[in-house]
Amino acid sequence: GYLGGYAAPAYAGYAAPAYAGYAAPAYAAPVAAVAHAAPAVAVAHAPVPSSAANTYRISQTARLAYAAPAVAHAPLAYAAPAVAHAPLGYAAPAYGVARYAAAAPALGYGYGAYGYAAPALGYGHALVH
């Protein structure tokens, strides 16, 4: 992976199509992704009451999360805490990644079924060669 703080396009920049419907842009800086992770986490853990006030708050949080391409491009990010917690280095069972690869640090995932290695912000934890 690049050590300059950007995801390598061939590895961490794009999600495997079979598991994620949307690809994360390769140009997203990891620092920006982590900084914008809070809205996605907030949406994933937000209560779902019927009050108009909370509905508005959740919709506003979702709007902010969608502004962070590296975190919020996948619709499942709002339903699955494991996806919203990607900056913490968890695998995303909602995408089926956990069946093929262990969790990679930070934003990188290893898609074992495809033979990709996840640089994960330059740490270079190659899961499959």
Swiss-Prot record:
Per-repeat ranges for Sequence: 7-10, 15-18, 23-26, 28-31, 37-40, 67-70, 79-82, 91-94, 103-106, 117-120
GO MF, any single term: structural constituent of cuticle
UniProt name for this protein: Cuticle protein 12.5
Function: Component of the cuticle of migratory locust which contains more than 100 different structural proteins.
Domain notes per entry: The tetrapeptide (A-A-P-[AV]) repeats found throughout the protein are also present in many proteins constituting the protective envelope of other species.
Keywords attached to this entry: Cuticle, Repeat
Record bears the keyword Metal-binding: no
Keyword Zinc among record annotations: no
